[in-house]
Every structure is written in C-alpha cells, then in structure tokens.
Amino acid sequence: MAHKKAGGSSRNGRDSEGRRLGVKKFGSEAVIPGNIIVRQRGTKWHPGANVGMGKDHTIFALVPGHVRFETRRGRAFVGVTPLAEAAE
C-alpha cells in the first residue's frame, strides 16, 4: 500500500510585493519640474528649497535644476539647485 494520504492545502506561499520606495534621483542629477526625487514613508528626508512634498511624503522637483542632499540640525534635507538663468 504505497499510497499517500490526501494532503491538506499549504497555508504558506504568499507575500506582499515590494513598495518601490527610496531615492529616485541622486545628488547632482538633473531634474525637471514634477520629477520624483524620493518616495518614502514618513519624513526620512525633509523638503528643502525648490521641492514639494505630496500627501504620501513623496518629494518632487518644482523647478528645473540639480538635486542636492544636505543635513541641517540632524535632519536630512533634499533640495534642487536651480539652473542658471539664461543671459538677457
């Protein structure tokens, strides 16, 4: 009698997908308005100059320029250094 008894279904074998969080544009990278710089939960990075923050704490560029990361008073800030204005 080389038979197996009917096995019950496994209760394992599922997991949630990753959330794709983190830095999307790194220091000195060029950005245009609307580019997402950081996707995060909470304010791991705080908004600095020329960036906005969405309701899910996503930091995005408001002006064309280059990304800048800095630390002030123990907090990490993300900003955008604007491109030099064209000569009039």
UniProtKB/Swiss-Prot annotation:
One GO cellular component, as annotated: cytosolic large ribosomal subunit
Pfam families: Ribosomal_L27
Gene3D superfamilies xrefs: 2.40.50.100
Annotated GO biological process: translation
Keyword Iron-sulfur in record: no
Entry's Gene Ontology molecular function annotations: structural constituent of ribosome
Origin superkingdom: Bacteria
Record keywords, A-Z: Ribonucleoprotein, Ribosomal protein
Residues covered by region (Disordered): 1-24
Family: Belongs to the bacterial ribosomal protein bL27 family.
Protein name: Large ribosomal subunit protein bL27
Organism: Methylobacterium radiotolerans (strain ATCC 27329 / DSM 1819 / JCM 2831 / NBRC 15690 / NCIMB 10815 / 0-1)
